[in-house]
């Protein structure tokens, strides 16, 4: 029973997230030989002010959107 977690900044549309979930689920089914019903996808979204790379907050590097 695979559990796949995506961590990303907020701002993607519901349609983008649905497309991601569909594609990653299909990939898990094909490569791991599991039933679709066994695949769980969790999307954790973060405010850009709570995420940093290279020592810089993403809200500064990329803006608040």
Where are the regions a protein language model picked out?
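A domain-level signal for the structural core that forms small-molecule/cofactor-binding pockets
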Residues: 2-65
């Amino acid at each position: 029973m695979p559990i796949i977690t995506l961590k990303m900044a907020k701002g993607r549309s519901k349609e983008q997230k649905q497309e991601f979930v569909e594609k990653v689920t299909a990939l898990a089914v094909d490569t791991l030989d599991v039933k679709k019903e066994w695949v769980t996808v969790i999307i954790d979204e973060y405010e850009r002010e709570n995420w940093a790379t290279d020592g810089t907050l993403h809200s500064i590097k990329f803006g608040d959107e």
